[in-house]
């Protein structure tokens, strides 16, 4: 068992289709104080295409149960880029999400990876919105949610001004890990269960992906049923620091990086700065003598900007990964 501090942030993600009001009351008594659930999209045609049919009334009932159980914060996940989505249909989804009045909203880009996720082969790729449509959807989402008082947090999150994420962004303390944005300063993440990922200060590890292997490792008394792991080099930590700073603050103090890692920033990253000048010419960022500043337009393409500092990108060029937009 773990001993929890009184101010611990204990979150749980639930599937609205398989729970009732008692579930939330029990969860709250167990100490959970934050909760998240996925809507993805309210449009029936979109839901049917991704085999996730969910009644609209169900979400409002779930939100009533959550509020009655007095959870401190509620997050809703949406996904754009799904089959049959249009700018207009997703605007309707945003309007209904606002009626639910969550504290946080995460709006993720759909990763269409049929080679890695065979179940996605059931999706007709001709029904997917193109990149231009997805970019317009994201722009409209930002406009609508910020006009309703939500703060745009990083690449894909929105939060009410009183939420801890928004407060952390204003104070410059916002952090990001592979799960998303967080207020926790460089905390270690320990993954439990099948496929889970652990993240330590300078290392990553992923548990077994196959159930039989996972159980056999646990039964054998292995301290960690890991399938793979990775130790970060100083170079990895340097580039991770830069990428995370840009993704969280949309600016970079070159001098601070130079002092932290004892290097001449402009000389060390000469080729990266040359690539960034092309993006600057497109209006995505400003290159100052001491700082890099991402523009509002550049925020929409922050993955493209930070990719310049990804030393492994060329090694991965032969593999398929999700697109930035």
Curated annotation (Swiss-Prot):
Binds 1 [4Fe-4S] cluster. The cluster is coordinated with 3 cysteines and an exchangeable S-adenosyl-L-methionine. It catalyses: coproporphyrinogen III + 2 S-adenosyl-L-methionine = protoporphyrinogen IX + 2 5'-deoxyadenosine + 2 L-methionine + 2 CO2. Pathway: Porphyrin-containing compound metabolism; protoporphyrin-IX biosynthesis; protoporphyrinogen-IX from coproporphyrinogen-III (AdoMet route): step 1/1. InterPro entries: Coprogen_oxidase_HemN, Coproporphyrinogen-III_oxidase, Elp3/MiaA/NifB-like_rSAM, HemN_C, rSAM. GO terms for biological process: chlorophyll biosynthetic process; porphyrin-containing compound biosynthetic process; protoporphyrinogen IX biosynthetic process. It is found in: Cytoplasm. NCBIfam families: hemN. Monomer. Involved in the heme and chlorophyll biosynthesis. Catalyzes the anaerobic oxidative decarboxylation of propionate groups of rings A and B of coproporphyrinogen III to yield the vinyl groups in protoporphyrinogen IX. Belongs to the anaerobic coproporphyrinogen-III oxidase family. This is Oxygen-independent coproporphyrinogen III oxidase. The gene is hemN.
């Amino acid at each position: 068992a773990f001993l929890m501090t009184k101010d611990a942030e204990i979150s749980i993600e639930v599937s609205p289709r398989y729970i009732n009001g008692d579930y939330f009351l029990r969860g709250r008594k167990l100490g959970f104080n934050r909760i998240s659930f996925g809507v993805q999209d309210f449009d029936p045609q979109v839901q049917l295409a991704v085999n996730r049919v969910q009644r609209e009334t169900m979400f409002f009932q779930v939100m009533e149960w959550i509020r009655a159980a007095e959870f401190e914060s509620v997050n809703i996940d949406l996904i754009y880029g799904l089959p049959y989505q249009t700018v207009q249909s997703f605007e309707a989804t945003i309007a209904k999400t606002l009626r639910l009045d969550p504290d946080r909203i995460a709006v993720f880009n759909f990763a269409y990876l049929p080679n890695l996720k065979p179940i996605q082969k059931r999706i007709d790729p001709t029904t997917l919105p193109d990149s231009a449509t997805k970019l317009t959807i994201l722009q409209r989402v930002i406009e609508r949610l910020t006009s309703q008082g939500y703060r745009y947090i990083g690449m894909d999150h929105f939060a009410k001004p009183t939420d801890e994420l928004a407060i952390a962004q204003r104070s410059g303390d916002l952090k990001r890990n592979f799960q998303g944005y967080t207020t926790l300063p460089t905390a270690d993440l320990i993954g439990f269960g099948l496929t889970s990922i652990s993240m330590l200060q300078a290392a990553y590890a992923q548990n077994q992906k196959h159930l039989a292997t996972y159980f056999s490792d646990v039964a054998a008394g292995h301290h960690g049923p890991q399938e793979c792991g990775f130790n970060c080099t100083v170079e990895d930590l340097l580039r991770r620091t830069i990428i995370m700073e840009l993704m969280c603050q949309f600016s970079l103090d070159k001098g601070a990086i130079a002092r932290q890692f004892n290097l001449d920033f402009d000389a060390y990253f000469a080729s990266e700065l040359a690539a960034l000048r092309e993006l600057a010419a497109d209006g995505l960022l400003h290159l100052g003598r001491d700082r890099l500043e991402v523009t509002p337009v550049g925020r929409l393409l922050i993955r493209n900007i930070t990719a310049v500092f990804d030393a492994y990108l060329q090694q991965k060029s032969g593999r398929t990964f999700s697109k930035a937009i």
